[in-house]
UniProtKB/Swiss-Prot annotation:
GO terms for molecular function: double-stranded DNA binding; FK506 binding; juvenile hormone response element binding; peptidyl-prolyl cis-trans isomerase activity. InterPro entries: NPL (IPR041232), PPIase_dom_sf (IPR046357), PPIase_FKBP_dom (IPR001179), PPIase_Fpr3/Fpr4-like (IPR023566). It comes from Drosophila melanogaster (Fruit fly). Its main location: nucleus. This is 39 kDa FK506-binding nuclear protein. The gene is Fkbp39.
Length: 357
């Protein structure tokens, strides 16, 4: 059972929170004043969600937010607005703590909703029966959602600093390991160097001793060459270099592989899971993204997404990253996808293939 959720926003005020229970926003309505623009800030990006005026006092929305997301709402204008929605039923939530909200109606909304519906059916089959939450717990959650905290974005910067420090330590370890690997062959060659001194001392011995030393010296010369070649055998384990030159494929779609994956290949008819970020080629402005949490799933070649994705994702391997440039007729065409995507827009997607099912 879903429970009502609402928030009254005053003009020029910011409301931010780390989400503790998934919820859905169904619409925004003008309260008092002439006009207000509703903004959403998430994942270091800002989005214009809706504009309400005296002429258009109410706008329907379809936004879902998951537990663990860090979001902030704020308005511009002289009017106060009301956000309306509902809390998701606890029994239907996944156990993942860092699922990310994505504005999926911007990427072939109807098809993606159908895809998400099939995903929910799969999750229900796997989850089994769960105990119902007490009414008192739901009431407490509603009270927490009614009071958004103001100016809570500083915590994100701290998290980023900690992540940078951790990644820095990992880079140092990787550097130390690689240096140690490169030094190993040199150490082996150094152990063989006493043969040179043995050669000098051998000159003072008889002819038989010199012949024995010559044979040993020949064997030692062959061994260092074999050992020096050992590091080259490790090179295939490194990430395969990707070509930066764009390739034009079906429908004029251009692809550039930034990272070539090593896992299973994405083929027509397979279901794939991806992270992505979409930008307008005209101004490089981000209109949609999904970079963490539960990846987006769809059937490749099944018409569930834009044509540019059906042909552009094909051939990728798990772990790979690819830039896909979709001309208008392989994206949203002359209609576009207002308000974010205008008519005849060329779209650029950075796609990472996470899994092939």
């Amino acid at each position: 059972m879903s429970m009502f959720w609402g928030l009254n926003m005053k003009p020029e005020r910011k409301y931010s929170q780390t989400i503790i229970k998934s919820f859905h926003i169904s619409g925004v309505a003008l309260d008092k004043g002439q006009e207000a623009k509703l903004y959403l800030a998430a994942e270091k990006q800002e989005y214009i969600v809706a504009t309400v005026t005296k002429a258009i006092p109410q706008v329907a929305l379809d936004l879902n937010f998951s537990k663990g997301d860090r979001i902030m709402f704020y308005t511009a204008g002289d009017a106060s607005v009301s956000l309306l929605g509902y809390l998701h039923d606890i029994d239907s939530e996944d156990d993942e703590d860092d699922d990310q909200m994505t504005i999926e109606n911007l990427l072939n909304s109807k098809a993606i909703k159908n895809s998400k519906k099939s995903e929910d059916d799969e999750d229900e089959n796997e989850s089994g029966e769960e105990d119902e939450e007490d009414t008192d717990d739901d009431s407490q959650i509603i009270e927490e959602y009614e009071s958004f905290l103001e100016n809570g974005e500083e915590e994100d910067d701290d998290d980023v600093d900690e992540d940078n420090e951790e990644s820095g330590e990992e880079d140092e370890q990787d550097s130390d390991d690689s240096e140690a690997e490169e030094e190993q062959p040199k150490a082996k060659v150094a152990k063989l160097s006493p043969g040179a001194s043995a050669k000098k001392s051998g000159k003072e011995q008889n002819g038989v001793a010199k012949k024995e030393e010559a044979k040993q010296q020949q064997k030692k010369k062959e061994k260092p060459e074999a050992k020096k070649e050992q590091p080259k055998a490790k090179e295939p384990a490194k990430q395969q270099p990707a070509s930066k030159d764009p390739r034009t494929i079906t429908g004029g779609v251009k692809i550039v592989d930034q990272v070539v994956g090593k896992g299973e290949e994405a083929k027509q008819g397979k279901r794939v899971s991806v992270y992505y970020i979409g930008r307008l080629q005209s101004n490089n402005k981000t209109f949609d993204s999904l970079l963490k949490g539960k990846p987006f799933k769809f059937a490749l070649g099944g018409g569930e997404v834009i044509k540019g994705w059906d042909v552009g994702v094909a051939g990728m391997k798990v772990g790979g990253k690819r830039v896909i440039t979709c001309p208008p007729h392989m994206a949203y065409g002359a209609r576009g996808a207002p308000p974010k995507i205008g008519p005849n827009s060329t779209l650029v997607f950075e796609v990472e293939l996470k899994a092939v099912h």
